[in-house]
């Protein structure tokens, strides 16, 4: 679920960067996505997009699926409930952890995707 994902990001990065900073970053962070990721953070977003696609193949609706999770320290932890919820939660938790580890390059925010994402 998009709202829960936002909170997971805040958990993993200890509130150092707001979730909206990732909405228009690189070629894959935010709606859509194409081309070659511009950096490590953008690769995190592509992996997350691909994970959501896989979840959708199983009949899940990742952007709308509510799941159970906890923030333990700086690690989002999923609480098992069902296959669909667990899958989506795992997608979001992995992405949030990836975001927290990847450098944020301000030059890759709000880029011209038509020219840079081929």
Curated annotation (Swiss-Prot):
TM helices/strands, residue ranges: none
One of the Pfam families matching this protein, by short name: Phospholip_A2_1
Catalytic residues of the enzyme: 48, 92
UniProt note on tissues of expression: Expressed by the venom gland.
Keyword line: Calcium, Disulfide bond, Hydrolase, Lipid degradation, Lipid metabolism, Metal-binding, Secreted
Cofactor(s) of this protein: Ca(2+)
EC number assigned by the record: 3.1.1.4
Cited PANTHER family: PHOSPHOLIPASE A2 (PTHR11716:SF51), PHOSPHOLIPASE A2 FAMILY MEMBER (PTHR11716)
Entry similarity comment: Belongs to the phospholipase A2 family. Group I subfamily. D49 sub-subfamily.
Stated name of the protein: Basic phospholipase A2 PA-13
């Amino acid at each position: 679920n998009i709202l829960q994902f936002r909170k997971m990001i805040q958990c993993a990065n200890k509130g150092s960067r707001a979730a909206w900073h990732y909405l228009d970053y690189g070629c894959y962070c935010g709606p859509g996505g194409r081309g070659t990721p511009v950096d490590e953070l953008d690769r995190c977003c592509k992996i997350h997009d691909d994970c959501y696609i896989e979840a959708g193949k199983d009949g899940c609706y990742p952007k709308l699926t509510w799941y159970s999770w906890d923030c333990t320290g700086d690690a989002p932890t999923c609480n098992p409930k069902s296959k669909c919820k667990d899958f989506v939660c795992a997608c979001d938790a992995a992405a949030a952890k990836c975001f927290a580890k990847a450098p944020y390059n301000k030059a890759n925010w709000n880029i011209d995707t038509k020219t840079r994402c081929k």
